[in-house]
Swiss-Prot record:
GO terms for cellular component: extracellular region; host extracellular space. InterPro entries: PLipase_A2, PLipase_A2_dom_sf. This is Acidic phospholipase A2 Omo-E6. It catalyses: a 1,2-diacyl-sn-glycero-3-phosphocholine + H2O = a 1-acyl-sn-glycero-3-phosphocholine + a fatty acid + H(+). It comes from Ovophis monticola. It is an enzyme of class 3 (hydrolase). Binds 1 Ca(2+) ion.
């Protein structure tokens, strides 16, 4: 499920601190 995948990305992002999600062009620090 795409929603679960996005949640996984967010969890990884929270740990790594910085990430870029091309599909939405989202930059989160």
């Amino acid at each position: 499920d795409l929603m679960q995948f996005e949640t996984l990305i967010m969890k990884i992002a929270g740990r790594s601190g910085v990430w870029i999600y091309g599909s939405y062009g989202c930059y989160c620090g």
